[in-house]
Design a protein with these regions (language model features):
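Extended, subdomain-level signal for the structured scaffold at the beginning of enzyme domains
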Residues: 1-91
Length: 92
């Protein structure tokens, strides 16, 4: 089964993140919400989401990563060195 990590940071766009997770899980993929900081992440519209994991090197074992938009969520992802490293890793 393919493993997909949806990376979340404070201020993520709830629709972009949660719709993706919903569709992928319905399609039979293992899809985990992964935070760059806390177990509970607040979206750009104030909805708090409990994630499955906190970012770690284990994410490199996944088949794909998804980076939802939203502000300041996208900026927070962009500014995190671990996320930059993962994007470069998955770009190979």
């Amino acid at each position: 089964m393919k493993k997909i990590a949806v990376l979340l940071a404070e201020g993520f766009e709830e629709g972009e993140a949660l719709f993706v997770v919903d569709v992928l899980r319905r399609a039979g993929f293992q899809c985990n919400l992964v935070s760059i900081n806390e177990e509970m992440v607040k979206g750009s519209h104030g909805i708090r989401v409990l994630v499955d994991k906190i970012i770690s090197d284990e994410i490199k074992e996944y088949d794909m990563i998804v980076l939802p938009g939203g502000l300041p969520g996208a900026t927070n992802l962009r500014d995190d060195e671990r996320v930059i490293e993962l994007v470069k890793y998955f770009d190979k």
